[in-house]
């Protein structure tokens, strides 16, 4: 902790260990048994789907008198007079969230319940337990990201050399303190091997891509993948698809929405593990990317008319370690509605220009700025601008 604290970005200190321990709450001891793929409990998405586990029925853990420390804590957070969204990353099972929302619905007025539920932003990795099914069926109004294949992109896509045992030993497990030494082996078919799995990390990484994404816009994509509306009447989102350069299989196009960022994620992971044991002068830190004079970490937007020349710059971008920086501008096609090509002049420099294309109706294009340093490991920072092209 003392070493990590020395690497904290100004204004964003690492929380004290005791603070983290104080907010860990015990949840329901739901019993789940691994079976085989497709042999577990029924799930509503995809159609006729089944999980890979058996699980206690939801009635055992949701209802009157079934509150846990965890569910009570969630209710307490929702009852606070706080306008901010409450993000809930679910990767171990949402039964306590199900109990919390049962209590919200049964112990509060309809208006208070509606207001509390509207604050929730919920990322669900796979189905995990029967509580996830119950929430889907009973709370369709929840802002929910339901990952089927997206979250698997962290271990199915990208350079294999960034997720094998040799990489883990060199960058995480060995000579990286107590945290690195505790990295778990992945189990499969009774075998335990040291490899990057991180299959549930998407639910957290989704919130950790400042400048690249906006968590409130699942269709835009980012470090935790990209999603699309499940239907036109709810706030539920399911796997989207990006063109995968290695495969046109549906699941591989979904995993690629996360996998396309894997090299940057792996290098960031390695750098942070170095922070555990190295002083700031010996470790690498990410660049601070500026976009058109904006030093914040928000996504920018601009509306331009067809035929108008657009000039964008990364001037002002800095690196904490004074490393040499390289730049790359590129069109992230899938989130936008513009379906053509954009000619980017200077796409490998700090400034880029393009001409807004002719369109018959307004269309959007997502332009990404990547800034990568020359340190070890090489770290990348992102900015995004959403351009809306309008007719003349």
Question: In which residue ranges do the predicted regions lie?
Answer:
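Hydrophobic/tyrosine-rich beta-strand signature of extracellular beta-sandwich/beta-rich modules
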Residues: 367-369
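Surface-exposed, flexible coil segments in extracellular/virion-facing regions
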Residues: 331-355
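Short, surface-exposed loop/turn segments at beta-strand-coil junctions that are enriched for proline
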Residues: 355-361
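Surface-exposed loops/turns
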Residues: 306, 321, 346, 361-362
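Extracellular and select intracellular beta-sandwich modules with Ser/Thr-enriched
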Residues: 378-385
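Short, solvent-exposed loop/turn segments at the edges of extracellular beta-sandwich modules
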Residues: 372-378
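N-terminal acidic, glycine/proline-rich low-complexity segments
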Residues: 1-311, 315-338
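Extracellular interdomain linker/stem segments of modular secreted and single-pass surface proteins
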Residues: 388-392
